[in-house]
Amino acid sequence: MPVIAPSILSADFANLERDIHNIEANGADWVHVDVMDGIFVPNISIGIPVVKALRPVTSLPLDVHLIIDRPIRYAEEFIKAGADWLTIHLESDQPQNTLACLDKIRAMGCKAAISLKPKTPAEAAIPYLAKCDMVLVMTVEPGFGAQKFMADMMPKVKKIRQMLDEVNPACIIEVDGGVDAVTYRTCRENGAEALVTGSAYFKAADRAAFVKTLRA
């Protein structure tokens, strides 16, 4: 059964606590938190104080996606703020720093993940797979919500699943971007076990039914 992780990037920021309680009530599994710095991607979203404020609001795991430059500088603070999963982009720093960051995340008892932008090939993840609890494949360009799903990312998902089965079978794959009541199926068929859904979840007339659909 897949993990369903609504992204608060599409929530009402003036009523964030309400929307997170809604995520819980509708049966989702994680809260996905996109952190953007305006450098690695052109958008700016939220930071450590917001993650810290969210932690006492929900018992659901906080799936924090650092879409930032040189995340090793901030990983420890996000974990202390309450992140349960911490995802860093392999494109965001030099390989040795990315490996060190993954080690730091896991040493602090947090689940570690890497993410790949659409133009990054699956093979770029090879040096990091043994140190990951999850690989996040972006199915849109990171930085903004409500983008169109890139179906041509599915061979990448399948390839990464094959590579993981050889070196780290327990590691799961998450997809993020344009996941809705139609596109979720191809994600699951190609090996995704966690689905980030933003605008499709928050715009759904019946959010609980939408979550059930993604699990069907």
Language model region names:
Residues 1-87, 92-100, 104, 111-112, ...:
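Conserved N-terminal beta1-alpha1 strand-loop-helix module at the mouth
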Residues 178-190:
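Acidic, divalent-metal-coordinating active-site segment for phosphoryl/phosphodiester hydrolysis
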Residues 115-119:
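Short gly/ser/thr-rich secondary-structure transition/capping motifs
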Residues 140-142:
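Short glycine-rich anion-binding loops that position phosphate/pyrophosphate groups of nucleotides
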Residues 32, 174-175:
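Generic enzyme active-site microenvironment
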Residues 88, 175, 197-198:
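Thr-Gly-centered strand-to-loop micro-motif
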Residues 58, 108, 167-169:
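Helix C-cap/helix->beta junction micro-motif
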Residues 190-197, 202-203:
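Acidic, Mg2+-coordinating phosphoryl-transfer loop and its flanking beta/alpha structural elements
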